[in-house]
Amino acid sequence: MKLREARTGVAVRVKDGLWRSEFGGMRGTVEHRWGHPDHPALDVRLEDGRSELFWFHELDKVQEKARTA
């Protein structure tokens, strides 16, 4: 995830290979942004309902698929 993408409401996926491997691959939504503007920590509401704190570089932005009616 790029720094400019780290904002509330963005859909994210936790990167694989982190020290907290149980979260690798999980998806969620950024709920809050904390800390220094150049290195924020993000509260993420995960798909299982838990809320966890991650550094912005531990996440990938999920590309939303266009919906067709």
Identify the residue ranges that each predicted region occupies.
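Basic/aromatic-rich interaction segments and small domains that mediate binding to polyanionic partners
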Residues: L3-T68
